[in-house]
Amino acid sequence: MYSAMTRSINILVEPTYLEDQSEPDQDYYVWAYHVTIENKGPETVRLRARYWKITDATGHVHEVRGPGVVGEQPLLRPGEKFEYTSGTPLGAPSGIMFGNYEMETAEGEKFEVDIPAFSLDSPHAKRMLH
């Protein structure tokens, strides 16, 4: 589990390699990632947008921007949490993802919340020792 806290908003991410949806012989590897967004602060906030930077082991970078997450712009009151699962394919057996969410308070103030960097490692990734 990977976690990051920004301005009392805690982001937890748990990636899972999906062997049954991957085709390693065709350089196609798929991961699911489960995200929990916890509002540990005193303000009600709404998740407005997301940004992801996904880099595979070959250095290929894919950036994703868009409104909300999984078709929603969830409202989180103090003490509430929102969870969702999504996924990403890579053309290499490993990679890394990170990003941020744009949040907005009830007063209209917007701020970014960090999504922690997390590794995407399949059993097909070659391990390197230094």
UniProtKB/Swiss-Prot annotation:
Annotated InterPro entries: ApaG_domain, ApaG_sf, Uncharacterised_ApaG
Swiss-Prot/TrEMBL GO biological process terms:
error-free translesion synthesis
Q: Where is the ApaG domain?
A: 3-127
Which protein are we looking at? Protein ApaG
Q: Which organism is it from?
A: Parvibaculum lavamentivorans (strain DS-1 / DSM 13023 / NCIMB 13966)
UniProt superkingdom: Bacteria
Q: Sorted alphabetically, which Gene3D superfamilies does this protein's record hold?
A: ApaG domain
